[in-house]
UniProtKB/Swiss-Prot annotation:
Name of the protein in its database record: Heme-responsive zinc finger transcription factor HAP1
Complexes and interactors: Binds DNA as a homodimer. Interacts with SRO9 and YDJ1. In the absence of heme, binds to at least four cellular proteins, including YDJ1 and SRO9, forming a high-molecular-weight complex (HMC) which results in repression of its activity and dictates its DNA-binding specificity.
Biased composition (Polar residues): 1-50, 143-152, 160-176, 432-447, 706-734
Region (Heme-responsive): 244-444
PANTHER family: HEME-RESPONSIVE ZINC FINGER TRANSCRIPTION FACTOR HAP1
Any coiled-coil regions, as ranges: 105-134
Length: 1483
C-alpha cells in the first residue's frame, strides 16, 4: 500500500506546506542531481537524525479507512475513492484529517459560511416580501391584483440586484419596470384562467389564496390530564391530541360519556325499584350525601320504622369488606401474637370488633367523621422479633379496600393495618411468597418504587456485602456474560452508543474476573471462552473498588437483561393469517453458511437458559449506586459513568416496559402505557440533563487542557494478560471525571514516567485514550439531545435543550481524531450521530411550529406546507439531508441557534436511504411498494462484512416512520382546520380533501410499516434481528395513531354531514328506532359482498378517499387486522393491552348493527349481565371509573367542554343544541369555540339516499307484557316506554341533540338522579348529571304507601328530587331551580352552588294510573332511543359494553378494569376535601 505524501488530490496550499516541511532543513544538500543525500551527509548531521527519531512525527495516513481495513490500494480521491465505490461502501469512505491542513480548512469553511449566509439572506427577503405582498390573507382578489404582484416581484428583483452589486441605478430601474410590466401581463392571464378553470385546475391558485391563513394550535390540540396527584399536560404531538382536534371524535365521545351516565341512571332506577319492591331502604348508604340533619346525628334520613317488618337491614348492602384482612395461616406454631394483652394466645392481631356489622371507624389521621377508611390501633401492635413477615394478607386487604385508601401514600397505615416500623426484618421471604406490596420503600422522590420481591431477601437493611453476595447468585455464569456482552455490542449497541466498548469490557474483566476463564484474550481485552467445560463457572466475587464501578455494574445488569429480552426467540409470535405474506421482507439467512447458522442457534439456546432477574437491577441501583439520592438531592458523586447509567436506566424503562411495575411505583395513570407516557420519564430526563450540565458535557472537551494533563493508564496495558488486575484502584478509567483529585499517587507516578519520554509507546497510547474519552464525552451529549427531541415528540412537551448553540459548543463525534481502521463499527456509529442529529434538526423545526406557543399561536399555512414538502423530499430520497437542513434555515423555519451551523462540513454521501432500499436490501428484484424502485446493481469486487449492518438499517427504518408520522400529523392538522370551513368558503373543500388524502396515505404507510415490523421480528437473521424490544413500542404507537385517523374517516363515511352545535338538530332527517326490512336486507347484502372483497384486498396499497360506500369497509378491515395483531402482542407487551382495548372499543362501536341477529336472542340480549359481545370480551371495563373520575379525563373535558352558556334565546329551542346549566358560570364564562355544521370530505349522494330511506321507515311496534303498544298513541303510556315528543320529532333522538330538557307531552318526565351526584357540582368541570334526555319513566309514588312514607322522612334536599308537586312551565326549562320541602319552585337557587336539572312530579304525568308493581324498566327500549349518532346507528348491545355498567355499590373499590383512556381511579388530592363526605355508618 502506497502512502506517498505528494498527491494531486490534496489542496495546493496543503501540498505546498507539506513539501516545504519535507525539504527543510537539508535543502542545500540536494543541489547535485542523483546524489545520495543520506550516504553523503556529514557526521555533523547525525545528532540531528537522532533527534528526529526521538520526535517520532505523528504521520497521518492519506488512504481512506476502508481501504486500509481491506488492505487494498486507495486512489485517495475525494470525497470517496473508487475502491469504496465499487465495493458499495462509498458512504463509509472516511479520511483522517491532517493536522497541518487545519488553517486551509478554516479558510474553506469561511468561504462556505459566507456563501450560505448570502443564500439565506436572499431566501428570507423573498419570504418577507411574499408576506408583505398580501395584506388580506383571505381575499383572492387582493392577492391576485397586479399591484400586489408587482410589489412581490419587484421586491424580489430588487433584492437580487442589490445582492449582485452590478449595474447602475438607472439600468436597475429600467429592468425593474420591465419586470413589472411582464408580471402584470402574466398575472392578468393567470387571473382570467383561474376564473374560468374548474376545481381541479385551480387547486394551485386556491392554495396560494390561503397561504397566509393563520392557525392557532395552542387551543385546538392541547390537553390537560387531571390526575389524582396532579396534572399532566399533553401537547399537539401526543396520541390523545387527535381526540380533541377532530370534531367527529369530540362529539362521539360526548355521546358516549353522556350515554354512560344515562345508563347508570337507568340502573339506579332499576335498583331503586328493586329495593322498593323488596321493602328495602331506597337510600344507598355507602354513597349517600351528608345533610344538615344527618351530619349531626349520623343517621339515615329515611325512617326505617315506616317499612314492613320483613325489610332487610341496610347494613347488609354495605360495600365495605367484613372479612378480616389478616391471613390467619401466617401464624406459625412458635409465633407470639403481636397484641400485648394476648401474649399467651395465638390470636389475630386485628380487633375483629371493629368490623362488626360492617362498621369501619375512621382512621386517626382523618378529621372528617364520615371517612370510609378503617382504623387499626397501631400503638397496641408490637411484632415479635422471630416474625419476618407482616401477618396481614395484603392480597385481600388491597383488593377489598377502596382504591383511594390503597393508593394513599401519606401514611403507611393507609396501606396496611399493621405498623411495619416495629417489625425486625432479618429473615428471608419464602420463594412461594405471593406478590406483596413492599412497605420498606420510601414514598417520596421520583424514583421511589413499589414492586414485588421475588426470590430475594427482604432487603430493608441489606449491607453492601449482602447485596453483592445476592448479585453473585443472580448473575449468569462467566461464559454466558461474555456472550451477552458480545451480542449487545454486535446488535444493540447502535441504538444506545454511549459507551467506549474497549474500556467497558476491561472494567467488566476487573469486576468479575472474566479473563481467568481462558488465557485467550481478544483485541478489546475481553476473554472469549471457547471450552464448554467452563460454561457453568459461576460468579463468586464482585470487585467494586470505586463508586464508578457500581455504575458499570448497573450498566452490565441492564445489558444482560435487555439483551436477553431481545433474543429473537423471546419475541412475540405473530400470526396474521393469509395477510402475513404481504408483510414479509427478505432476510439474510441465505448469505450465511449452515455452520454459522448452527453456531448462532446454539448460542441463542444457551443464552435463553440464563435470565438475569429484574430484581438484580433494583438492588444495584438502590444500595450500590443509590440512584434515588444522586438523581434528586446530591451531585457529589456525579460523573460520566453516573450519567451513562442514568441514560441506560431511562432507555431500559422505555424499552422493557413490562418490568416497569417492578422498578417503579408509578400509579396507573390510565395512559396508553405508564412506561412511555408517564411523567417519571420527564423527571428522569431532566435529572440526566442537569447531571450533564454538572459534568460540563455542554462544552467541548477541547476547551479544557487539564484533560490532556491527566493521562490515564492505557486500557491496553490492563488487557495484557491481566497484569494490573490485582490492583484495579491504580487504574483510572476513561469513564471517570479525569481530574487530579480522582487520580491516586500510583497512577500519577506512572503518568510521570510516560511524560518523561521513557516509554514513547505508552505515551502514544495514552493520547489515544484521551481522544477516546473526548469521543465518549461528545457521544453522551448528543445522545441526550436526541432523547430530549424524542420525548418532546412523544408527549408534546417543550424541549429542555432549546437553542442548543446558545449555550453549547460541543462538537459532533465526527470531530474526534480517532483512527477507525481497527473498529469499523465505531465509524458507522460516528456517521449515524451526524445523520441522526440532522434528522433531529428537521424534527425540531416541526416541533417549534407546533409546540412553541409564540409560533403555534399564529402559524401560517405556507410554513406548514414548506415543512411538509421538505420532509417529503427527505423521506423519499429526492433531497439530501444537508440540503433539507439548509433549506429550513434559509426559509426561516429553523434558527441557526438550534445547531444548523455545525453541519457545514458534513458528509454529503452518507444520508438516509430510501425506505424500499432499506426493506429490500440485497434483493433487487423484489418490491414491497407499488412505487418502489429497484436499487441499481454495482460492481462489487470484494464484499466488506460490515458490523451491525442490520441494526443500522432497522434504525433507518424507525427514522422513516418518525418522519412520516410527522407528515401525517401536519396534514391532519391542516385537514381539520379547513374541513369545517367548506360550508362558508367552498374553495377550502379542495384543500381539505387534498390534506385528508395525504394524511390517509401517510397513516396507511405507518400502518403497513407497523405490520411489517411485527411480522418479521421472529425471522432468523432478518432486518429486525434483536430489535424486537427496542422498536416494538415506537412501531405500535405509530400504528395506533394511524388507526385513530381511520376511525375519524369511518365516522365521516357512516355519519354523513355534521350539522353542528347550537344551529340545528344533529339529525336532519327523522329516524325511527326500527329498521326498514328492505334497507336492512340491502345493508346485509352489501356487507357480505364487501367482506368477500376484503379477502382479496391488498393491504400494501393506499386507500383512496373516493372509494365511495366501500371506504368504511376497507378501513374497518384494517382495524380488524390491527386488533388481531394487538391481541397477540398483549401476551408479551403490556402496552399492547390498552391498544387492543382501544381498537376493540371502536370496532364494537362502529360495527354495523343487525336488527335480525339481535332479535333472535330476544329482548334480554341487551342486558349487560347476561350478554357478552362475541368479538371483544370484558368491554364493560373500558370506562370503569365513576362520573367524578371521568370528569378528570382530558377526553371527557374536551368532549363536553365546548358547550355554550345557557342563554335566553336557547331556552325557547331546547332541541336545537346542548347546554350545561351553570357550567360556564363556574368556569368564568370561558368556553371552547362551537363546532360548526359542515359536510365531510367523504360525503356522497349514497349517504343521503340511505339516510332518507332510514328516515322514511315506520317505527316498529314493540312487545310489552305480551301486547303491542303504539308509539304514536296519545293514550296512557305504559311503564318502560318513553313517550314520543309532541313536537313531531322522532322518538329516537340522539343524546347530543337533547342535552337540554326536552318537552314531553306538555311536561317533563323526571328521573331520580343518583344521590352521589348532588354533591359533586362544585368542581370546575361540567358534570353529567345536569345533562338530561328522554328518561325512563318512574313508578307513581302515590301508589306505594311505604315509598310515600319514606319520602316524608327525607331531608329537604332529597325531597326536592323525590316529592316535587309542581309542574314546571316550559319557559323555565333552562333556568336554575331548586325545590324546598313543600315542593314549591324557587328560581335562582341551587344546591351546593350549582344548578340542577328541572324536575317535575310523576303525579303530573299520565303514569299515575299505573301502580309501582307494574313498573319494569326496558333497557332495550332505552338503548334504542340513544343508539343513533348523527345518522350512524350504533349497535345497542355494543353501547352497553362500550359505556360500561352501573357502578354497583357492592363492587366499589375494585380496580381490575383497565381503561385505555386516562381515567384516574382516585380523587385528586385537596380538591374535594371541602365538599365530599360520605355516610359509611348509619345508626
Amino acid at each position: 500500500m502506497s502512502n506517498t505524501p505528494y498527491n494531486s488530490s490534496v489542496p495546493s496550499i496543503a501540498s505546498m506546506t507539506q513539501s516545504s516541511v519535507s525539504r527543510s532543513p537539508n535543502m542545500h544538500t540536494a543541489t547535485t542531481p542523483g546524489a545520495n543525500t543520506s550516504s553523503n551527509s556529514p557526521p555533523l548531521h547525525m545528532s540531528s537524525d537522532s533527534s528526529k527519531i526521538k520526535r517520532k512525527r505523528n504521520r497521518i495516513p492519506l488512504s481512506c479507512t476502508i481501504c486500509r481495513k481491506r488492505k487494498v490500494k486507495c486512489d485517495k480521491l475525494r470525497p470517496h475513492c473508487q475502491q469504496c465505490t465499487k465495493t458499495g461502501v462509498a458512504h463509509l469512505c472516511h479520511y483522517m484529517e491532517q493536522t497541518w491542513a487545519e488553517e486551509a480548512e478554516k479558510e474553506l469553511l469561511k468561504d462556505n459560511e459566507l456563501k450560505k449566509l448570502r443564500e439565506r439572506v436572499k431566501s428570507l427577503e423573498k419570504t418577507l416580501s411574499k408576506v408583505h405582498s398580501s395584506p388580506s390573507s383571505n381575499s383572492l382578489k387582493s392577492y391576485n391584483t397586479p399591484e400586489s404582484s408587482n410589489l412581490f416581484m419587484g421586491s424580489d428583483e430588487h433584492t437580487t440586484l442589490v445582492n449582485a452589486n452590478t449595474g447602475s441605478a438607472s439600468s436597475a430601474s429600467h429592468m425593474h419596470q420591465q419586470q413589472q410590466q411582464q408580471q402584470q401581463q402574466e398575472q392578468q392571464q393567470d387571473f382570467s384562467r383561474s376564473a374560468n378553470a374548474n376545481a381541479n385546475s385551480s387547486s394551485l391558485s386556491i392554495s396560494n389564496k390561503y397561504d397566509n391563513d393563520e392557525l392557532d394550535l395552542t387551543k385546538d390540540f392541547d390537553l390537560l390530564h387531571i390526575k389524582s396527584n396532579g396534572t399532566i399536560h399533553l401537547g399537539a404531538t401526543h396520541w390523545l391530541s387527535i381526540m380533541k382536534g377532530d370534531p367527529y371524535l369530540k362529539l362521539l365521545w360526548g355521546h358516549i360519556f353522556a350515554m354512560r351516565e344515562k345508563l347508570n341512571e337507568w340502573y339506579y332506577q332499576k335498583n331503586s325499584y328493586s329495593k322498593l319492591k323488596s321493602s328495602k331502604c331506597p337510600i344507598n348508604h355507602a354513597q349517600a350525601p351528608p345533610s344538615a340533619a344527618a351530619a349531626a346525628t349520623r343517621k339515615c334520613p329515611v325512617d326505617h320504622s315506616a317499612f314492613s317488618s320483613g325489610m332487610v337491614a341496610p347494613k347488609e348492602e354495605t360495600p365495605l369488606p367484613r372479612k378480616c384482612p389478616v391471613d390467619h395461616t401466617m401464624f406459625s406454631s412458635g409465633m407470639i401474637p403481636p397484641r400485648e394483652d394476648t401474649s399467651s394466645q395465638k390470636r389475630c392481631p386485628v380487633d375483629h370488633t371493629m368490623y362488626s356489622a360492617g362498621m369501619m371507624p375512621p382512621k386517626d389521621e382523618t378529621p372528617s367523621p364520615f371517612s370510609t377508611k378503617a382504623m387499626i390501633d397501631h400503638n397496641k401492635h408490637t411484632m415479635n422479633p422471630p416474625q419476618s413477615k407482616c401477618p396481614v394478607d395484603h392480597r385481600n386487604y388491597m383488593k377489598d379496600y377502596p382504591s383511594d385508601m390503597a393508593n394513599s401514600s401519606s401514611n403507611p397505615a393507609s396501606r396496611c393495618p399493621i405498623d411495619h416500623s416495629s417489625m425486625k426484618n432479618t429473615a428471608a421471604l419464602p420463594a412461594s411468597t405471593h406478590n406483596t406490596i413492599p412497605h420498606h420503600q420510601p414514598q417520596s422522590g421520583s424514583h421511589a418504587r413499589s414492586h414485588p420481591a421475588q426470590n430475594r431477601k427482604h432487603d430493608s437493611y441489606m449491607t453492601e456485602s449482602e447485596v453483592l453476595a445476592t448479585l453473585c447468585e443472580m448473575l449468569p455464569p462467566k461464559r454466558v456474560i461474555a456472550l451477552f456482552i458480545e451480542k449487545f455490542f454486535k446488535h444493540l449497541y447502535p441504538a444506545i452508543p454511549i459507551l467506549d466498548e474497549q474500556n467497558f469490557k476491561n472494567h467488566v474483566n476487573q469486576m468479575l474476573s472474566l479473563s481467568s476463564m481462558n488465557p485467550t484474550v481478544n483485541n478489546f481485552g475481553m476473554s472469549m471462552p471457547s471450552s464448554s467445560t467452563l460454561e457453568n463457572q459461576p460468579i463468586t466475587q464482585i470487585n467494586l473498588p470505586k463508586l464508578s464501578d457500581s455504575c458499570n455494574l448497573g450498566i452490565l445488569i441492564i445489558i444482560l437483561r435487555l439483551t436477553w429480552l431481545s433474543i429473537p426467540s423471546n419475541s412475540c409470535e405473530v400470526d396474521l393469517g393469509e395477510e402475513s405474506g404481504s408483510f414479509l421482507v427478505p432476510n439474510e439467512s441465505s448469505n450465511m453458511s449452515a455452520s454459522a447458522l448452527t453456531s448462532m442457534a446454539k448460542e441463542e439456546s444457551l443464552l435463553l437458559k440464563h435470565e438475569t432477574p429484574v430484581e438484580a437491577l433494583e438492588l444495584c441501583q438502590k444500595y450500590l449506586i443509590k440512584f434515588d439520592e444522586l438523581s434528586s438531592i446530591s451531585n457529589n458523586n456525579v460523573n460520566l459513568t453516573t450519567v451513562q447509567f442514568a441514560i441506560f436506566y431511562n432507555f431500559y424503562m422505555k424499552s422493557a416496559s413490562n418490568d416497569l411495575t417492578t422498578l417503579t411505583n408509578t400509579n396507573n395513570t390510565g395512559m396508553a402505557n405508564p412506561g412511555h407516557d408517564s411523567e417519571s420519564h420527564q423527571i428522569l430526563l431532566s435529572n440526566i440533563t442537569q447531571m450533564a450540565f454538572s459534568c460540563g458535557l455542554h462544552r467541548d472537551p477541547d476547551n479544557f487542557p487539564q484533560l490532556n494533563a491527566t493521562i490515564p493508564a492505557t486500557s491496553q496495558d490492563v488487557s495484557n494478560n491481566g497484569s494490573k488486575k490485582a490492583n484495579p484502584s491504580t487504574n483510572p478509567t476513561l469513564n471517570n471525571n479525569m481530574s487530579a483529585a480522582t487520580t491516586n499517587s500510583s497512577s500519577r507516578s506512572g503518568s510521570a514516567d510516560s511524560r518523561s519520554g521513557s516509554n514513547p509507546v505508552n505515551k502514544k497510547e495514552n493520547q489515544v485514550s484521551i481522544e477516546r474519552f473526548k469521543h465518549t464525552w461528545r457521544k453522551i451529549w448528543y445522545y441526550i439531545v436526541s432523547m430530549d427531541v424524542n420525548q418532546s415528540l412523544s408527549l408534546g412537551s417543550p424541549r429542555l435543550l432549546r437553542n442548543l448553540r446558545d449555550f453549547s459548543d460541543t462538537k459532533l463525534p465526527s470531530a474526534s481524531r480517532i483512527d477507525y481502521v481497527r473498529d469499523i463499527k465505531e465509524l458507522i456509529i460516528v456517521k449515524n450521530f451526524t445523520l441522526f442529529f440532522q434528522i433531529d434538526l428537521c424534527i425540531i423545526a416541526v416541533l417549534n411550529h407546533i409546540l412553541n406557543v409564540s409560533l403555534a399561536r399564529s402559524v401560517r399555512k405556507f410554513e406548514l406546507d414548506s415543512l411538509i414538502n421538505l420532509l417529503k423530499n427527505l423521506t423519499y430520497g429526492t433531497e439530501n439531508v444537508n440540503d433539507v437542513v439548509s433549506s429550513l434555515i434559509n426559509k426561516g423555519l429553523l434558527p441557526t441557534s438550534e445547531g444548523g451551523s455545525v453541519d457545514s462540513n458534513n458528509d454529503e454521501i452518507y444520508g438516509l436511504p430510501k425506505l424500499p432500499d432499506i426493506l429490500n436490501h440485497g434483493q433487487h428484484n423484489q418490491n414491497l411498494y407499488a412505487d418502489g424502485r429497484n436499487t441499481s446493481s454495482s460492481d462489487i469486487d470484494k464484499k466488506l462484512d460490515l458490523p451491525h449492518e442490520s441494526t443500522t438499517r432497522a434504525l433507518f427504518f424507525s427514522k422513516h416512520m418518525t418522519i412520516r408520522m410527522l407528515l401525517y400529523l401536519l396534514n391532519y392538522i391542516l385537514f381539520t382546520h379547513y374541513e369545517p370551513m367548506g360550508s362558508e368558503d367552498p374553495g377550502t373543500n379542495i384543500l381539505a380533501k387534498e390534506y385528508a388524502q395525504e394524511a390517509l396515505n401517510f397513516a396507511m404507510d405507518g400502518y403497513r410499516n407497523c405490520m411489517i415490523f411485527f411480522n418479521n421480528i421472529r425471522n432468523t437473521n432478518s432486518l429486525f434481528d434483536y430489535m424486537n424490544v427496542i422498536l416494538s413500542y415506537p412501531c405500535l404507537d405509530i400504528g395506533h395513531r394511524s388507526l385513530q385517523f381511520i376511525v375519524c374517516l369511518i365516522l365521516r363515511a357512516k355519519c354523513g354531514p355534521l350539522t353542528g352545535m347550537r344551529e340545528s338538530s344533529i339529525i336532519t332527517n327523522g329516524t325511527s328506532s326500527g329498521f326498514n326490512s328492505s334497507v336492512e336486507d340491502e345493508d346485509v347484502k352489501v356487507k357480505q359482498e364487501s367482506s368477500d372483497e376484503m379477502k382479496k384486498d391488498d393491504f400494501m396499497k393506499d386507500v383512496n378517499l373516493d372509494s365511495g360506500d366501500s371506504l368504511a369497509e376497507i378501513l374497518m378491515s384494517r382495524m380488524l387486522l390491527f386488533q388481531k395483531l394487538t391481541k397477540q402482542l398483549s401476551k408479551k407487551y403490556n402496552y399492547a393491552i390498552r391498544m387492543n382495548k382501544s381498537t376493540g372499543f371502536f370496532v364494537s362501536l362502529l360495527d354495523t348493527p343487525s336488527k335480525k341477529s339481535d332479535s333472535k336472542s330476544g329482548g334480554s340480549s341487551f342486558m349487560l349481565g347476561n350478554w357478552k359481545h362475541p368479538k371483544v370480551s370484558n368491554m364493560s371495563g373500558f370506562l370503569a371509573g365513576d362520573k367524578d373520575q371521568l370528569q378528570k379525563c382530558p377526553v371527557y373535558q374536551d368532549a363536553l367542554g365546548f358547550v355554550s352558556p345557557t342563554g335566553a334565546n336557547e331556552g325557547s329551542a331546547p332541541m336545537q343544541g346542548m347546554s350545561l346549566q351553570g357550567s360556564t358560570a363556574r368556569m368564568g364564562g370561558t368556553q371552547l369555540p362551537p363546532i360548526r355544521s359542515y359536510k365531510p370530505i367523504t360525503y356522497t349522494s349514497s349517504n343521503l339516499r340511505r339516510m332518507n330511506e332510514t328516515g322514511e321507515a315506520e317505527a316498529k311496534r314493540r312487545r310489552f307484557n305480551d301486547g303491542y303498544i303504539d308509539n304514536n298513541s296519545n293514550n296512557d303510556i305504559p311503564r318502560g316506554i318513553s313517550p314520543k315528543p309532541s313536537n313531531g320529532l322522532s322518538s329516537v333522538q340522539p343524546l347530543l341533540s337533547s342535552f337540554s330538557m326536552n318537552q314531553l307531552n306538555g311536561g317533563t318526565i323526571p328521573t331520580v338522579p343518583s344521590l352521589t351526584n348532588i354533591t359533586s357540582q362544585m368542581g370546575a368541570l361540567p358534570s353529567l348529571d345536569r345533562i338530561t334526555t328522554n328518561q325512563i319513566n318512574l313508578p307513581d309514588p302515590s301508589r306505594d304507601e311505604a315509598f310515600d312514607n319514606s319520602i316524608k322522612q327525607m331531608t329537604p334536599m332529597t325531597s326536592a328530587f323525590m316529592n316535587a308537586n309542581t309542574t314546571i312551565p316550559s319557559s323555565t326549562l333552562n333556568g336554575n331551580m331548586n325545590m324546598n320541602g313543600a315542593g314549591t319552585a324557587n328560581t335562582d337557587t341551587s344546591v351546593n352552588g350549582s344548578a340542577l336539572s328541572t324536575l317535575t312530579s310523576p303525579q303530573g304525568s299520565d303514569l299515575a294510573s299505573n301502580s309501582a308493581t307494574q313498573y319494569k324498566p326496558d333497557l332495550e327500549d332505552f338503548l334504542m332511543q340513544n343508539s343513533n349518532f348523527n345518522g350512524l346507528m350504533i349497535n345497542p348491545s355494543s353501547l352497553v359494553e362500550v359505556v360500561g355498567g352501573y357502578n354497583d355499590p357492592n363492587n366499589l373499590g375494585r380496580n381490575d378494569a383497565v381503561d385505555f383512556l386516562p381515567v384516574d381511579n382516585v380523587e385528586i388530592d385537596g380538591l374535594v376535601d371541602f365538599y365530599r363526605a360520605d355516610f359509611p355508618i348509619w345508626e
